[in-house]
Amino acid sequence: MVPRTLLNLIDKNEYLKIVSDLYISNGFEFYLVGGAVRDGILDIDTKDFDFTTNATPEDSISLLNSNGYKTTEIGREFGTIELQIDDNSVHITTYRKDTYENTSRNPSIESAADLNTDLSRRDFTINSIAYSIKENELVDPFLGLKDLASGTVSYTHLRAHETNV
C-alpha cells in the first residue's frame, strides 16, 4: 500500500502526474525514485524530484521538447536530463548500471535493461524504492520500506560505503 503522505506529495505537485502520463502514454516506463520517495513516505516536503526510465536521453529530449517542455542535458555521461516546468525542475535518468574497479571510486556507467538493475546501484535501501505514479505502486526490491519503518540505514550493495571516502 502506498502511504497517504507520498500521495499527498504527488497531489501537491500535479505536474509530476502530467510528465508521468506523457512517458507512459508513449510506451516508456517511468518511476519516481530516491529521496523524493523516501521523503514523501516520511511526510517530509521536497522539491527534489528524480525519475528513472527506460527512455534514452535522446528519447526524453525529443518527447519533452515536442510537447513544449524545455530540457537541458546536465549529465550526458550519467544519462541525465533536466526538465523545467515553470519554476520547477525534474531530473530524468535512463536506467543504468554502475560498476567499480577494485581500487576506483568512479563508476563505469552503462545502460541497464530494467528498473531493478537501476535501483541496485543506489547507495541505501531507503533510496532504492521506486514509485509508479500511473500504477500507484511502490517497487521495493531491497526492503527499503522495512528499513524506513525500523529507522535502519542499510547499504544496497557492498561498495556503497566506499564511494564517500
Segments (PLM) and residue ranges:
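Catalytic cores of the polymerase beta-like nucleotidyltransferase superfamily
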Residues: 1-162
